Curated annotation (Swiss-Prot):
InterPro entries membership: DNA_mismatch_repair_MutS (IPR005748), DNA_mismatch_repair_MutS-lik_N (IPR007695), DNA_mismatch_repair_MutS/MSH (IPR017261), DNA_mismatch_repair_MutS_C (IPR000432), DNA_mismatch_repair_MutS_clamp (IPR007861), DNA_mismatch_repair_MutS_core (IPR007696), DNA_mismatch_repair_MutS_N (IPR016151), DNA_mismatch_repair_MutS_sf (IPR036187)
GO cellular component: cytosol
Entry keyword annotation includes DNA repair: yes
Domain of life: Bacteria
Function statement: This protein is involved in the repair of mismatches in DNA. It is possible that it carries out the mismatch recognition step. This protein has a weak ATPase activity.
PANTHER family: DNA MISMATCH REPAIR PROTEIN MSH1, MITOCHONDRIAL, DNA MISMATCH REPAIR PROTEIN MUTS FAMILY MEMBER
Protein name: DNA mismatch repair protein MutS
Amino acid sequence: MATQIDASSEAAAATAAAQHTPMMQQYLRIKSEHPDTLVFYRMGDFYELFFEDAEKAARLLDLTLTQRGASAGTPIKMAGVPHHAVEQYLAKLVKFGESAAICEQIGDPATSKGPVERKVVRVVTPGTLTDAALLSDKSDVFLLALCVGHNKRGVASNIGLAWLNLASGALRLAELAPDQLGAALERIRPAEILAADGTIESVPAGMGAITRVPAWHFDIASGTQRLCDQLEVASLDGFGAQALTSANGAAGALLIYAAATQGQQLRHVRSLKVENESEYIGLDPSTRRNLELTETLRGTESPTLYSLLDTCCTAMGSRLLRHWLHHPPRASVAAQARHQAIGALLDAPPNAGLDSLRSALRQIADVERITGRLALLSARPRDLSSLRDTFAALPALRERVAEIASNAAALGRLEAALEPPPGCLDLLTRAIAAEPAAMVRDGGVIARGYDAELDELRDISENCGQFLIDLETRERARTGISNLRVEYNKVHGFYIEVTRGQTDKVPDDYRRRQTLKNAERYITPELKTFEDKALSAQERALARERALYDGVLQALLPHIEGCQRVASGLAELDLLAAFAERARTLDWVAPEFTDEIGIEIDQGRHPVVEAQVEQFIANDCALNPERKLLLITGPNMGGKSTFMRQTALIALMAYVGSYVPAKAARFGPIDRIFTRIGAADDLAGGRSTFMVEMTEAAAILNDATPHSLVLMDEIGRGTSTFDGLALAWAIARHLLSHNRCYTLFATHYFELTQLPAEFPQAANVHLSAVEHGHGIVFLHAVEEGPANQSYGLQVAQLAGVPAPVIRAARKHLAHLEQQSAAQATPQLDLFAAPPVVDEPECNEPPAAATPHPALERLLELDPDDLKPRDALDLLYELHTLARSGPADAQR
């Protein structure tokens, strides 16, 4: 019975196929193998898409949708793109999260019976990009596979991740608890996620394109063996991955998928890194966003810490910087080695110094990505010429590094890494033309002298005219026929023409080709041989060049690991040089590390804000076992958030390995950085602003340790005053008594300023401001003690709130304060303003306020006329005036 059903199904399929044209049968067969992928089907100079693919591509790529003929009674909808412009269309598709199968003609149209043979040669997906036209120079593209491990009760116990940068060959694994998945994906930012049907719901929304993969691809035993085969090892012990379970299953699925999209082995995936949470300073998603490491809160790329630090001369250095910022090591050893290298670069003599080194680095190609394309046999001619020129420049670059490496072990290691693979430069120099064409099909890629046959074919093609002149001269001399001519036409090819009166002088080796009324045309063995070569020389030269180029790619494969080593060394050297340039240009210093708990920053500055303003007020920050929590008060816009963020950024920069914007800085161990700064409704997740705020606070209270740095900004403001105050008080107490972490706690709740009376480890500081009438001048200086006013109405006035609203607010504030005093209720919010008299009606002009003497003095002076000593004296004078009111000054 089963056999009969199978036979009838096959017969039905054959009948259905017979209703289509042979070409459409071929297309539908290929499409059936890639049902969820747009198939780009090569037809001559175009890639065509059909049926639903055509409709989708027309909509996404703004293509013209046409309709030609019918197949099996169905109109054939078509959309196409020129083959030479396909990369730009693929780039657009990838941005939409789509994948495309590139189907090429592999048969010879001249010998094909029926449709030319075609097959899919590569599949372009969001996570498997390697072509330069599809990639951003300064960011990596990751393909990630996710495997959920379950315990005996069937409950998810861990999640295994494997992610691959196909352009470089870097493969990483990690195993983590299910509740850590969101933070891990936020850090990795994969472009494409592979998951089995039953685990797709585990992936948070908006994390990348999701591709369904058969569950059996995630088999742990098969994945472990596939990893061993890929890395050519008997065991994964050397990589620390033998004990992993779900991560190895994820790696197996990832390697199957990546190899299938490329249609070949992944020769450049030769190393493995297992990431452990304890290696890096923990940064949860909200911390990465709030500190604006690589993206602003508005979603732009600048101004961020990354945009400020990225003065790298190579794309490799820029990508490494992005990785370092998201992976600051907990151990200070790595950071200290980087600081030592930066110091050596800054102290180097001018002839081998920083500027000279960076000038040389600007000539370096993207060796990392070129190597990836080499391994996949997709490198283009200019990739190879760029690689050759880079390797040729390495000896001089190594000499510069060697001159300064004696003072920094890291530079010595990098100098050794910059040695090109033996024989690689020689091969590239001999084989590749000085300035090759962009594509092999254009010719002119292989250098002259590399292959005698190719040189001969080129000579024939290029020197055809000269050969004919030389032959004509020789034949005239040999035959004595003075008017003998050697010519060519498209019908008969090359020939020797002799007039009728001279035919008796024709040699025996002449063979008649054509008889005319007044002349005979002949061919000789030599001319026939030349004709065969000349007429096919260009075509044969291109074919020979293609074969030679493929041979060069194959010959370079053994050098892949050496090229990867060079790329890694160049990227790190470039990034350290960029750190040195930033330190020199922006007046940054090398931080110090200690095993003692504490953070000490002397005259610290916010690196990004400082670059955006003309003058930045530097501030100190001291946290230690006796001073674990700073209660920060002061007006809105006074600089509380900036001060908190700059402390976290300076600490992060120190552990990343950069110098820091401060006069001096000293750090004890830091394991995690948490931020609870600002919030908004999570509409997609169905969470209110207050719920988002409490969720972030809960994560901090549950996970912060004595080595964690916590930033809390106005916690509790999203609910009623009493609820908010109670929560803020309890959270601050818990951070002091249980977590005992470094904490910067900004608040407007007056009651919290009494916390140091209960906990000596807490201290009050405030951001200073000067009131002028109903206005305010922010001084942005951090001073000891709590603030005495919040200046909320003054800030509202600065924001442009209409004057009638401000006056009404002042009247109501006075009423509330009087009511509060009469009821003897505690003051809940910062801070009680001085008694306020009734404001005049809205149609009456306000009484003129007495200008504050500090502001008057500021308005009198011309900053351009001040000498350094005068400026210092003036600063002391303003400080004295600021502490006194107008009445004191008048006295």
